[in-house]
Amino acid sequence: MKIRVELINGNEHRTSSTPQQPQQNPSVSHIFDGETAVKDHIKVLLTHFKIPVDKVSSYALQNPFTLAYVEDSFLTPERLVEAEKSYFILRMKPHAIADRVVDQLTKIEPTSPHIKDTIFNIRYQMKDVEYVEEFIIKGGINQLLAVIIKSRGNTQSYALTALRCFMGYNSGLEEVMSRPQLIDKLYSLVCSVGVLPSVCRQAIELLFCVCNFDGFQLVHRSAKNHAQETSTPAYSNLITLLSSGDMETQLNTLTLFNCLLDNAPNPRKSEKLLSRWQQLGIIKILKSQEHVTHSDFRTQIARFQANSGFGIDGSGRKRTLTRQLSTQELEFQLHQFREQQPLISLLTSELKFLRNAIKSAIENGSYINYRAPTERYDEYSQRKLEMIGDSPTNLQFLKRNDKFTNAFRKSMYVRSPNTSDLFDSSTLEDTYDGNNDTNSCTSISTSSTPIHISQPTTLIVPSTTPNHPPQQSQQTPPLQLQKEKEKEKEKEKEKEKEKEKEQQQQQQQSNKQSTPKPNLSCLLSPITISNTLNNNNNNNNNTNNNIIKSNNNNNNNNCTIKDLSPIVKSEKSNEDEIHEISLNGASSNHEEPIKYKLQPTKSPITPSKRMKPLHWTRILNSQFEGKKTIWNSYLPEVTFEEELFVDLFSLYTERIVSFSGSPVGSGTSISGGGPIKSKPIQKVISVLSQKRSNAIIVMCGKLPSDDILIRAIRNLDSNKLSLDGVSSIISNFPTSEELASIHELHSNEVILDKPERWCLMIDGFPMIKHRLRCWEFMLKIEDSLKSIIESIDTVLLACKELRTSITINCLFSLLLQLGNYLNGGHLYRGQSDGFNLESLSKMIEIKDNSNSGSLLDFAIKTLYQQSPMKGNSNTSIHLELAHVPNASLINFTDVGTSVSKLLQDYSEIVLMSDEIQQTTDKDDPFLDIVPKFMGTILLILKNLQTKFLETEKYLFETIDYFNPTNQTLQQYQQQQYQQYQQQQFQQNIINNNNNNNNNNSNNNNNNISGNTTTTTTTTTTTTTGSIINNNNNNNNNNNNSNNNIINNNNSQSNLQSLLHPQYYLSNSSSSSSSSYKITPPLSSSLSITSQEWNQQKFTCEKFFTLFSTITTAFKKSPSKRLSQKGFGLKISNSDDPMAVIIEALKTGSPNDMVKRAF
């Protein structure tokens, strides 16, 4: 059978499938014959997908719908016919994917850019439990932890996400919990400076997950160890995060504190933690968060309030973070009650619908759906108080809901022959009167009394007046039940006649003995079988029925049949009585005893607040008269503090913060002192835009406190303030306009917002912007120099390798011979002594007659067959040209631009440093650090410039060595200088036009000190701008360098010589006058706009990329190269019929395949 097979190599999530562009994986149509083993099929498929056959044990065939692996037993003709309609999946097994991922994490450095893709793929591969287990067994979590600690940025965030996913499995959680050092490193990651907010959030989330799973000691131990290492108080860094600008970080941090309090081993430990956090200022920070309206954050604050408390007096503990409910909170509760009215209306409509459904079911005589509403409303009745709360008082329909619930319960136990007897007519009414419910009489509950139904039971309900018989149901029983009932009556008819006279005598005696009763509310049974009752005169004929004896002397106290209900609570509990009726199926010879409702002996209590309910079973002493119990014996009176008890167990928890704009009640102060004194409200004013304010708030959350920040800037302490912090301060530094607006509004009557206060603070430090620029240059220049030097060294070594490579010489010699042979007899192309480098691309494009290889492939194959290349490894050229692939990625033009930028930055920093030295005091550490550093950097930059120029010259000579031209290096330098002058002239024109459009009134203030006219041999251009002003007193123009103006100081003569390489100035002379020509910045000499030069010259990237392509062509092994069709070797083997079939399917010519096989 021919079945399509798709390859999924573990990265199927990369391609997103859409209806317009469905997911497309590599696929092939493969023939399954049912006799070949699955392993052999996988080998053939791996060969097709160009995967090494030795990895056959790592792959398996899978059914895409059942996800079951295809075994040999599956390859039956019937199943193959079914599979032909769908397809199979060829994918790596989970243990193989785990081996590959762990191996990549082990071999690749955590700081490598390739590790990011590997970590990103992990969470998509965790859908298989087998993969997760294999990953954990092979130590993948250890490698993941190394990535978390050593990596930065998104890689670190992806690694934390993967670790969080592994903790979702039991084995992963146990692995994390069994390694305390992992928790220590996670805690140190949270407290480190310069970590991304997303990384910090995920690390905190992992910590409180560990804490919730019995990991309190692990997290607490990590906090103490970190405090000992950093010599700081425990949890101080976490409390600092509560005031950060990132809301998610604040929320996770507060959640961690709540988890620590919830999982503390004992109350004493919780009190110690709360005391320590209070000293660190957590209460002050939480108080400052009153303006936060985030619902989750407010919930966590309320949770922290419920867990925390500090003693105000010696009698007990009382919360210090609670406040009384304000008027707005009460309005909010009222608003919630109003919002519940639609729900109540909906439930009322649903109840009416259920009544009609029940009525319809009773009429049909079926019990099909009697359980569904019972279970639903049982669950609802348990939660109705929580759902509605203090709802409007007229909720009688909920009481009727209880009636229906109990009625349905009775239907589960009482299987009466007549279904309609389960309900009376009043229960099935569509409408009801709430006032009548309050005045309705209570019925006798028989739920606690056993009901015997061996014989049909009926209840005779006495009439309310002599002229009105009891109401009868209009329902008729089924025929079968009616026949059975008649048969039973006939059998009992004879016995009834004999006992008829005796029962009449007993009834007369009982009526005589009955006395009038006080005002009572009757409780009638919910089971009323009215179909069998014709009138009260026929009661003597039914001797086997239970009789309800009622006193009719007082008509005003009797109940009407209309108000019958299963359960109704009496309004007047002092006047209620309960009648016990036993339904035993036999006539009673004695009158049933009457029990009055038990009355409590204790006086009622009215709490000051609504308290939490305590669900218990009440015991009244009147139930056990004459029996000695602990409750009717003497119990001592014990007093308790009512106010404290109400605060601790009231139903509503007072909030730590009030709603925005709501008045604060007169509670206790946040520190536990006396009442809060009202202060005049001062308006908080924000001057900056919302975007600027948010950026400054986020930045302040990552920076240390103000005093530590100022001290670090003065001392240039990189341990307290990193490069990221310095750069963020410079990027968010307030402008002069913003500072002027802030100073204008700053007064004692106005409170500025936090970003404005930070701007005033940072502006108060003298020359702080120049100082930050100097410090940033000192921190960045080391990495910049390292990157530039590595690029220069790579290009220099690559040039030397090309000049000394034996393989390249042999290859070029062979290509020259082959080219002359191809062009033999041609007048202009033949008899060549060499060829241009661009000809190599044409040699790659020329294919042989079988279209299986190029001219370059043939030359490389021939080199392997020659004696000089025989026996050499196919990686010999990679050893000879080891640096060429890396050099092909380097843009030497950008390297020159970077060197030029370093020199320009150095000149600006020197001027700024001189200004700071003239204005600062003698004890400033700046005077000892910066001048010495700048002197050292000057020597390094000189050496860097020399090395760059030498490498550029050598690169020019190497390119000219392989691709000779008639142009000299001096001509090339002159063209480069002319190109720079043209670009500078165009840039100055654009800048002048922009200045004129922006401000026409300031047309003369363009900071241009002079014009320079440069005449060359080819063109004459006028260059405006870029003039060095030698005026030592003109220091105000440093901030207005729009036209590349460099304000030079005569004391920087060494810097002048550094900025002006002599090879750029063909006609330059010593600058003895007051003004001289500014030289262009250093740039690579390999980007020329001359058309003739570009036709012959190669850029650095293009030149080395060409040779990198040649090295890549050598990667193909000789065996694979010689197995191509053009060299007479067959692909398939006649001994393997499956390979012959696959080759026939590929080529479409089975006859040719058979010929080639034989």
UniProtKB/Swiss-Prot annotation:
Keywords: Actin-binding, Coiled coil, Cytoplasm, Cytoskeleton. The keyword Cytoplasm applies. GO terms for biological process: actin filament bundle assembly; cortical actin cytoskeleton organization; culmination involved in sorocarp development; gene expression; sorocarp spore cell differentiation. Its main location: cytoplasm. Residues 20-388 form the GBD/FH3 domain. One of its GO terms (molecular function) is actin filament binding. It is found in: Cytoplasm, Cytosol; Cytoplasm, Cytoskeleton. Residues 601-998 form the FH2 domain. Disruption phenotype: Null cells grow normally during the vegetative phase and, when starved, migrate normally and form tight aggregates. Subsequently, however, null cells make aberrant fruiting bodies with short stalks and sori that remain unlifted. Aggregates are also unable to migrate as slugs, suggesting it is involved in mediating cell movement during multicellular stages of Dictyostelium development. Pfam families: FH2 (PF02181), FH3_FHOD1-3 (PF24959), ForC_N (PF21573). Residues 438-481 have a biased composition (Low complexity). The keyword Cytoplasm applies. GO terms for cellular component: cell-cell junction; cytoplasm; cytoskeleton; cytosol; macropinosome. Interacts (via GBD/FH3 domain) with activated Rho-GTPases. Formins play an important role in the nucleation of actin and the formation of linear actin filaments. The DAD domain regulates activation via by an autoinhibitory interaction with the GBD/FH3 domain. This autoinhibition is released upon competitive binding of an activated GTPase. The release of DAD allows the FH2 domain to then nucleate and elongate nonbranched actin filaments. This is Formin-C.
